């Protein structure tokens, strides 16, 4: 999470964001800003504050504002996985992270196997717990999104099948 407090890294990232948003679609010739094919810009996939929460929160705020200033026509989201069940301190605070004026909707991910709620080698025993925990996780995030008055998108979901042989 030192990225968020590294001025050079953030400067390079912001230059990339400006380049990307300023691009032209090579298929239809429209600038990305005016392209209806783009639904939303996302800050990152599963960004985490880890041991640098204040710098992370500042990065969320500034990056979302930068994107909105460059492209007011499209939605902006974080790409957050939500308040995961991992016991490690990850610097995530779903409600406060999404409570930013330039974040248009909330995102979360759901990985029942990764979070040890489901074991594909013991599916009969662990599937009921996976369903229970998944529903609880969804309700918890939905409740917070409602308080924020923002839509909620479950962006990623994963579970193994076929006895984990895939």
Model-derived features with residue positions:
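Active-site mouth of glycoside hydrolases
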Residues: 1-116, 127-143, 147-150, 161-166
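Aromatic/acidic polysaccharide-binding cleft in carbohydrate-active enzymes
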Residues: 121-122, 154, 158-165
């Amino acid at each position: 999470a030192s990225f968020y407090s590294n001025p050079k890294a953030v400067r390079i990232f912001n230059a990339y964001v400006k380049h990307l948003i300023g691009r032209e679609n090579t298929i239809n010739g429209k600038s990305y800003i005016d392209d209806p094919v783009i639904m939303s810009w996302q800050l990152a996939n599963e960004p985490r504050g880890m041991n640098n929460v204040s710098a992370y929160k500042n990065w969320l705020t500034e990056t979302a504002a930068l994107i909105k200033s460059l492209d007011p026509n499209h939605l902006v989201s974080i790409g957050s996985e939500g308040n995961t069940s991992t016991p490690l301190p990850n610097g995530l605070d779903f409600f406060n992270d999404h409570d930013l004026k330039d974040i248009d909707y909330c995102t979360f991910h759901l990985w029942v196997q990764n979070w040890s709620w489901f074991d594909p080698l013991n599916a009969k025993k662990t599937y009921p717990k996976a369903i229970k925990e998944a529903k609880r996780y969804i309700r918890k995030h939905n409740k917070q999104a409602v308080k924020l008055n923002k839509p909620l998108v479950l962006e990623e979901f994963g579970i193994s099948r076929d006895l984990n042989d895939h």
